[in-house]
Amino acid sequence: QPTAAIALDREEISELPHFGDDLYRAINVLPGTSGGDFSARFAVRGGLYDETLVTLDDQELMEPFHLKDFQGIFSIIDPEAIGGVELTPGGFTAKYGDRMTGVLDMVTRSPKATRAGIGISLTTAWANAGGLFSGGKGSWLASARRGYLDFILKAVADDDDDGAPPSPRYWDAFGK
């Protein structure tokens, strides 16, 4: 019998506890998943993190992480761009290929009205906008983020230290 999928809409995702405005860290608290404190990567039902298929609007994402030298500390997915997710922890059909442990299917949101926003969090600054066109027959969405861990590390670095502090910087943009 297939395992029941866990489906979450935008509001439910925002209510999950997570760090750094990271969708993957929110997924990491769902039943059947496990992960580390430092990395955004998660595993499903004891498998390896790369045994889970990740799709965004039916397109497979390979290694969707920033700062891979730091164990993929943040995902490339802006939670502001996501309308919903569905996690299937096992028991899925061959349609999903050779993945063994699970499927994480994400769908981007479709704006219902024109709106824009900017924000700042503990680790990220972001801006997004979305709206309708053609009399409401279509919608558009744009999102950009810039992580600023590099600024934080430079600010707390010891001036007597001979080596330069690590400079973990990242940015991403999304549009549809």
Which residues are covered by each model-predicted region?
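A generic structural micro-feature
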Residues: 96-98, 119, 167
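Short aromatic-enriched loop/helix-cap "lid" or pocket-rim segments at secondary-structure transitions
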Residues: 1-3, 97-100, 130, 153-155
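Gram-negative outer-membrane beta-barrel proteins
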Residues: 112, 126, 148-154
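Short loop/turn motifs that connect adjacent beta-strands in outer-membrane beta-barrel proteins
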Residues: 35, 94-96, 111-115, 133-138
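Outer-membrane beta-barrel translocator domains and adjoining extracellular loop/strand segments
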Residues: 69, 152-159
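Periplasmic N-terminal accessory/gating domains of Gram-negative outer-membrane beta-barrel systems
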Residues: 1-93, 103, 107-110, 124, ...
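Residue-level detector of the transmembrane beta-barrel scaffold of outer-membrane proteins
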Residues: 53-55, 84, 103, 115-119, ...
